[in-house]
């Protein structure tokens, strides 16, 4: 999977190079104020949050782990390990809260937990994702609720 359109300003319709005809579907638009008189277009857009976490914590060379979920429930899970460190990501694509029960291959020490919801995604001053909790000790089984239309990532990777 690749996210090609990071910055709207780098891609115009038909590759014309015309900055007034740029595609508005990237993670930000560095020309928001200059061309559109809208500085808010220069802010990092919400889809950057989950994408950046997945890129950071599922690095090249990771071993993807087998997961078992009932997709009809609207929950999807991915997990990986690299250098003895683990990551688990889960998404609830439904309009209802769901309960999530995880069985992990090993306990996670010093883990961080990230949650994303449209109206709640903790970030630092630059808009980069911040963990909701850190320094967690998670046993080989873990239960949590996953709100409707939300994303969860748990990792002990640095």
Which residue ranges define each predicted feature?
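Flexible loop/turn segments at secondary-structure boundaries
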Residues: 8-15, 95-98, 120-123
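C-terminal beta-strand-rich structural cap/linker in extracellular carbohydrate-active enzymes
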Residues: 131-158
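Ser/Thr- and Asn-enriched, surface-exposed coil loops between beta-strands
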Residues: 65-71, 94-96, 134-142
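Active-site proximal loops enriched in glycine and acidic residues that flank catalytic Cys/His/Asp
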Residues: 4-6, 90-93, 104, 115-117, ...
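Acidic Ser/Thr/Pro-rich low-complexity disordered segments
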Residues: 21, 118-135
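Solvent-exposed beta-hairpin/edge-strand motifs
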Residues: 105-125
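Carbohydrate-binding surface patches
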Residues: 70-108, 153
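Aromatic/acidic polysaccharide-binding cleft in carbohydrate-active enzymes
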Residues: 1-58, 62-75
């Amino acid at each position: 999977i690749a996210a090609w359109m990071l910055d709207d300003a780098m891609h115009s319709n038909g590759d014309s190079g015309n900055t007034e005809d740029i595609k508005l579907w990237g993670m930000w638009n560095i020309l928001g104020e200059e061309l559109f008189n809208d500085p808010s277009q220069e802010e990092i857009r919400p889809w950057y949050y989950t994408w950046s976490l997945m890129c950071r914590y599922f690095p090249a060379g990771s071993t993807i782990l087998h997961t078992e979920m009932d997709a009809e429930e609207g929950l999807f899970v991915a997990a990986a390990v690299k250098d003895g460190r683990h990551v688990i990501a889960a998404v609830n694509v439904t309009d209802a809260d769901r309960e999530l029960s995880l069985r992990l291959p090993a306990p996670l020490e010093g883990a961080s937990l990230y949650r994303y919801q449209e109206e709640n995604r903790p970030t630092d001053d630059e808009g980069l994702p911040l963990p909701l909790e850190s320094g967690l000790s998670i046993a080989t089984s873990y239960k949590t609720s996953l709100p409707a239309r939300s994303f969860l990532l748990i990792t002990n990777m640095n």
